[in-house]
Structures are given as C-alpha cells and as structure tokens.
Amino acid sequence: MAAIFSITIRRARRDDVGVIVAMLADDPLGSGRERLEDPLPASYFRAFEVLEHASHIQLVVAEDEDGAVIGCLQLCVLPGLSSQGASRGLIEDVRVATHCRSRGVGEKIVQWAVAEARAKGCALVELLTHNTRVDAQRFYARLGFQPSHVGMTLRF
C-alpha cells in the first residue's frame, strides 16, 4: 500500500465518536469490549463529554486528505511526584482504520503525541499495549519505545 503523506490531526468532535468506537472495536480484543449498536450506547457520548472538558486529556483523530477519520489516540498528561515531580504523557487507544494500516498513519499520530507531551513539559511518554498484540509491540519498539513495566488490570 502507498503511504499516506498528508493527514490532519485535530481534537475529536462529538460526531467522530461513532467512527472512533468502530476503530476501537475492529480487532479481536476490542470486538469483545465495545458495543457497535445503532444508536450507539449513550455511555460513549457521556465519556466523550468528560474527555472534551478535561484540560489534561486530548482525544484526537487523524483525517485523510478527504476529511475522513482514519486514526485516533488519547493523550493524558499526568503530573506526579516521582522522578522529581515530572509530568508524564500517557498514550492510549491508538487505532488506525483497517484500510489505512501500514501506511504511516499510526507513526504520524504517535509522533504527534510524543511532541505534544514534550511541549507540555512531560519528562517521558508511556503507553500500554496488550501482551497479545505482538505487531503493536514491534511498531512501538520501532518508534523508540522500550518495554519497562508489567501492567496489571483489575476489572469491575
């Protein structure tokens, strides 16, 4: 596939929620977590309202030249006392539309998030990826991320 050379990264809008949820659901893990229904469950829109007004969180989308949403991620800036009071960026929910994968979209949006975290004074950027997502782990390693922690989850 040819690389996508021109994408626009912007804050997500309410009318993007359906496309974002569809991308979140478009893999074996996400398909079991997300509910793609028509209409979309109100819980997604309530969560979007919280994200939209949180000053330390940016939910962004990547648009192609035609204005179609083809990727997304969430960047959280977390202040902390560790590392001498350093803030850290947490990158979450990185997704690229199936038909646009392996075309540079993921790399561009992750690079945007790293630059944004740095511009906001973060000393480091972290992300989590499920241990079964071997391709994603290779992708992040190629971008300079290194395995450093063991993630633990407790679901309610």
Language-model-derived ranges and their functions:
Residues 110, 117-129:
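Conserved GNAT acetyl-CoA-binding A-motif
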Residues 8-22:
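A short beta-loop-alpha structural element at the N-terminal edge
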Residues 93-96, 102-115, 142:
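Conserved acetyl-CoA-binding loop-helix of GNAT-fold acetyltransferases
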Residues 61, 68-77, 90, 95:
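Conserved beta-strand in the GNAT
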Residues 80-91, 101, 147-148:
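A conserved beta-turn-beta hairpin within the catalytic core of GNAT-like acetyltransferases
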Residues 107, 131-149, 154:
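Conserved active-site alpha-helix within GNAT-family acetyltransferase domains
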Residues 49-61, 90:
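A short helix-loop-beta-strand connector motif used in the catalytic cores of GNAT acetyltransferases and
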Residues 25-47:
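Conserved GNAT-fold acetyl-CoA-binding loop/helix
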